[in-house]
């Protein structure tokens, strides 16, 4: 299938690129040139850009059901998100954590920390594929996310990685950053997070009663520490704080109205709720099963 041009009843002009699966606004001049001879649009700067970036390539349809090299290259060239698991280490020992011995899925998970060299190799590769002619996601977000464990245990390494990302060219992709955190260390890094406009998701189940399953390794509650840190961030960066989101795990102790009221009165926000997953049969699976409560319709 070859690219084609068309105009609307309002005299707006477009080119459809089947190779990129995109509709691109064009000028009347390019529209007329394309109708006369598609090669004529190469004399125009924007037309040359479309050619050089694969928008004018003919699309070869394939129905064999197989993924080939070009499919992989195209997908990687337009990848929307990269997630760095900074570490499998965590400074909490939440009673329902999917990495504890109540679940069997991750029992053989090894503790580790991502090296800067590994992150750099990933970033370099992403930059190279974003600059490939198959990239049709110009001006689309490219999100670099940081996960754990607790990623802020290695906050300085996150800063090193982010600074390297900011030094790279991703071919006009809109680079953004996000992080999921338990907020026990967020106060130490809020300046950096705010400066780089991180999208932050905080795991917090509600007030001290609802948050009782989120404990330190010594089984001490985390609520006071987390609440104090969040208030520090809210007071230090009130506008940025408005972008922070909260996720609450729904358990047998959850009272939805009370949780929502806590977040509204404390932070002016509504949380999202996540259910516990049914564990596979294991020696300690009953602990999770006792905590499970179906989210109310």
Language-model region placement:
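Conserved alpha-helical substructure of the radical SAM core
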Residues: 68-189
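A short acidic, amphipathic alpha-helical/loop segment
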Residues: 160, 188-192, 258-262
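Conserved radical SAM core fold
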Residues: 103-104, 151-153, 183-187, 199-220, ...
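Auxiliary Fe-S-binding modules of radical SAM enzymes
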Residues: 1-20, 24-39, 289
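Glycine-enriched alpha-helix->loop->beta-strand junction motifs that scaffold or abut catalytic
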Residues: 194-200, 267-270
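N-terminal [4Fe-4S]-dependent radical SAM core
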Residues: 2-15, 20, 44-83, 101, ...
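Radical SAM enzyme [4Fe-4S]-AdoMet core and its adjacent flexible, acidic
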Residues: 214-227, 231, 235-297
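Hydrophobic faces of well-ordered beta-strands that scaffold small-molecule active sites
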Residues: 82, 142-144, 177-179, 200-202, ...
